[in-house]
Amino acid sequence: MEGNKKMNKTWNLKEMKKLIPLALPVLVVNLSIVGMGAVDAIVAGRAGVTDMAAVALGSSVYLPVALFACGVLMIIGPVIANMRGKSHESRVGYMTNHGLWLALMLSLVSMPVIYVLRNVFGWISDDAAMCRMASAYMFAIMWGLPANLGFVALKSLNEGSNMTRPAMYVGLCGLLLNIPLNYMFVFGMYGFPRMGGAGCGAATAVIFYIEFLLMFLLVYFNPKHRPYRRHIISWRRPTPSVITHLVRLGVPIGVSQLCEVMLFCAAALVLAPLGETQVASHQIAGNVGGLVFMLPLSVGLAASIRVAYHHGRNDLAGTRSAILSSYVLVLTICLCTFGGITLFREQIVHLYNDSELIVSTASVLLVLAAAYQLPDCLQVLSVGVLRGFRDTASITFITFFSYWMVGFPA
């Protein structure tokens, strides 16, 4: 009996050692994405209040469409991990190629949607200058969507192959390039025209293509991908049944992401009439909560890969070990973040604003945000585990019911 307990503990420790190195680079990638948004806000703010508001408004309309498309592609990683678990390595390149085709198809659908949505700003604001700038921002960033989705497809190949560091390196390069490119396009440096806030969209679009090119080169010249390299870059017509299979599994993930991001957009609109103090306090709490959320989100993605791999091998003990290790890691993260935010809530708010009214209001909201971390961490991890089992339909129903039938009315 003691020997079995020791064996289970050993297996859990081994699984934890595989889970953490898989999750850490994903965390860096997620933080680099958040960092790019912060750089956009800072540079646009230097250009003017109108530019900063236009970037915020444009991104709030662009992001739901982009996140839905990216969510559909997120299933590629678990599918590839499952294939590797079944020792179907020969089909990995074939599936990646279909992922790239799906990325192209999603781009052809999403870009016209973004183009049409550029015209909604006139309905929600009387500020003509801000609306024009927000529309120009969306038009600029729209052209980078195909590269962004292609990057996600190739990133999913690496994640499904237990290689998350390449995306980390590319994400950090994108973050570093975002600063000079923003200044070049926003302020019209080195011969480029001055675009104002719309320049943030142009800079992001350029970075998407750079990231896609870097990820493609890292995949193509990686010796581990050599056996199926020619399948990845094949221009052979995709098989409709494979595309349908990926869409059937991926669309529920995209819908669940859409439900979540749309709720937070709606919450911001509901808070607007309550005054700038409430809006600013909510923004601070949401920003801190969003940063902390990247921790369990990264573990959830790593868990989906490990669960899919063990499930593909029909390894029940390995699957159980991956799930248990993931929950232990996430619960540890929850306790640490709850304690840190609760103890240092006022110091955290002071990093954003020194107004006593905002400090007192936001400090209370931070305690609620810290308490919210526990169910939210468990939720995002459970979604990752279900994704590893390729059970995505239940994710959509649970997310829609929780966020819109319970959360929004409350």
Range-by-range predicted roles:
Residues 21-40, 140, 144, 174, ...:
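Transmembrane helical elements of multi-pass membrane transporters/channels
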Residues 52-111, 115, 148-167, 268, ...:
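Small-residue-rich hydrophobic transmembrane alpha-helices
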Residues 165, 175-213, 360, 393, ...:
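Membrane-interface helix-loop junctions in multi-pass transport and translocation proteins
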Residues 59-62, 106, 173-178, 203-211, ...:
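Transmembrane alpha-helical core residues of multi-pass small-molecule transporters
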Residues 1-23, 80-146, 192-251, 307-372:
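Short alpha-helical transmembrane segments in multi-pass integral membrane proteins
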Residues 10-42, 46-47, 60-71, 75-79, ...:
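N-terminal transmembrane alpha-helices
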Residues 31, 35-53, 121-128, 184-195, ...:
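Helix-terminus/linker motif at the lipid-water interface of multi-pass membrane proteins
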Residues 49-60, 134, 138, 201, ...:
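Small-residue hotspots at the loop-to-helix junctions and early N-terminal turns
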